[in-house]
Amino acid sequence: MIKAVVGANWGDEGKGKITDMLAKEADIIVRFQGGANAGHTIVNNYGKFALHTLPSGVFYSHTTSVIGNGVALNIPVLIKELNEIVSKGVPAPKIKISDRAQMVMPYHILFDQYEEERLGGKSFGSTNPVSLRSTQINMQKSVSR
């Protein structure tokens, strides 16, 4: 049986927690979009974790976690999260990453910081380079493969 958890409110709906509950019996969990600006907190037998890049299925050894092509993939954040969960005793997760996942590059982060500084008190709230990365996808100038 296929189950999908989809949000319609730009986040903060509890999708990560619901996905974690469903992951207990899932063979595959797919994170299909979003970036490290989004996050969800999972509390389980291993401890409390704030995930920003990893799919919720990483805590279940029988589950394959997929990072899909719509994800703004920030490699340093991914590595940090992997190291954090493994250091707390979570078995190394089975992860597959789409070869079309969009890479967050250092210039995306710098551009986001400069834009926030330029806007000053009228800033839109950092999206942690997701907005620039999304713009580049729409312009077909993103970095993948």
Language-model regions, residue ranges each:
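Non-transmembrane, aqueous-exposed alpha-helical and coiled segments at domain scale
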Residues: 1-145
